[in-house]
Amino acid sequence: METLNHECGVALIRLLKPLDYYKEKYGTTRYGAGKLYLMLEKQHNRGQEGAGVACVNLDVPPGEEYMFRERAEGKDAITEIFGRLDDSFNGQLFMGHLRYSTTGKRGLVYVHPFLRRNNWRARNLCLCGNFNMTNIDEVFDEMVSQGQSPRIYSDSYITLELMGHRLDMEVEKEYKEAVQSGLSGLDVTRYIDDHVKIENVLRTTLSGFDGGYVMCGLTGSGEM
């Protein structure tokens, strides 16, 4: 097995108890954010070009933010990010990434995690990873032939858009099943959140990729 040298670093956390539990036991509801910081610092040598973090809070009502992302460039990115986070960066799901570029591309636009927004919780998608898509030209050309016009030519962005498209299709399938079963309104949303199958998204997306992959992802409804 090869030793780790200059690969990107990733971290993924899911809290299994209510936030009040951590407040009572540890004196803070930001237990997850603290653990994420420690996990990223332990891999600091693997991310000298930038860093990013994301968080999902499953317990906020409509009208309030529930999916957060912060990114920064440079070797001090971890310190910069956590120095500007406030109490709103809190929840049950956390993800972090340390960037080491293998393509030479620079700029905050290339720093993970990547985020795809939507008003439906289940359609929100955040991705980060340590990977190189070796057939990016082929995948890009296929997207263009379907009528799409990707804004950025990078394997990370293309992966986000392809998975996001498949996630939309999966949510739409669950929506139709919910309506056909007689549900309406918020009951449809709850049905989708409970039944969306992220494995279907992965199976139908990754089959067309070549390369080496370590990927982490979050959806607004709590899939990881």
Regions found by a protein language model. Name each.
Residues 1-224:
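Conserved short alpha-helical segments that host acidic/polar catalytic motifs at enzyme active sites
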